[in-house]
Amino acid sequence: MITQIRVDDRLVHGQVAVVWTKELNAPLLVVANDEAAKNEITQMTLKMAVPNGMKLLIRSVEDSIKLFNDPRATDKRIFVIVNSVKDACAIAKEVPDLEAVNVANVGRFDKSDPASKVKVTPSLLLNPEEMAAAKELVSLPELDVFNQVLPSNTKVHLSQLVN
């Protein structure tokens, strides 16, 4: 079972590896990212950021969807990290019973034109493609889509920010 999908353009870092995995009680972290799945240096870097005792899988978005829909995954607590709203939306549309997507940190490190981005919050800078994906994501039924950088922060529903 997926405990949460977190959209964070930094993928695995201290907030994710230590704070959120503990908060969500998720011993399995899946990075669903096409580029990371193909890049051995990125994979080594991500593995170094994960605490001992935690399992990390790095898969393409397509392979991640297959993994999440495998019946053997239903009894596991899985925390999923993607680096774009577009990827979170692709997973949310294909994986039934997904409950929560945390659009936490987006747009500060991508290579898109800063002038094209809308500053939704200090941690969310969405280009037109990501904004369209965010609007599609919040329109999906029975899915809690929110922005919460840290567990101690107030959860803000994304529909209040992008509509």
Swiss-Prot record:
Record remark: domains: The EIIB domain is phosphorylated by phospho-EIIA on a cysteinyl or histidyl residue, depending on the transported sugar. Then, it transfers the phosphoryl group to the sugar substrate concomitantly with the sugar uptake processed by the EIIC domain.
EC number: 2.7.1.-
Functional note: The phosphoenolpyruvate-dependent sugar phosphotransferase system (sugar PTS), a major carbohydrate active -transport system, catalyzes the phosphorylation of incoming sugar substrates concomitantly with their translocation across the cell membrane.
Domain annotation PTS EIIB type-4: ranges: 1-163
Single GO cellular component term: cytoplasm
Any one GO biological process: phosphoenolpyruvate-dependent sugar phosphotransferase system
Gene3D superfamilies: Phosphotransferase system, sorbose subfamily IIB component
Residue ranges crossing the lipid bilayer per the database entry: none
Keywords for this protein: Cytoplasm, Kinase, Phosphotransferase system, Sugar transport, Transferase, Transport
Organism for this UniProt entry: Streptococcus pyogenes serotype M6 (strain ATCC BAA-946 / MGAS10394)
Protein name per its UniProtKB record: Probable phosphotransferase enzyme IIB component M6_Spy0801
Compartment annotation: Cytoplasm
Chief location category: cytoplasm
Any GO MF annotation of the entry: protein-N(PI)-phosphohistidine-sugar phosphotransferase activity
Broadest EC class assigned to this enzyme: transferase
InterPro entries associated with the record: PTS_IIB_sorbose-sp, PTS_IIB_sorbose-sp_sf
Active site feature: H13 (pros-phosphohistidine intermediate)
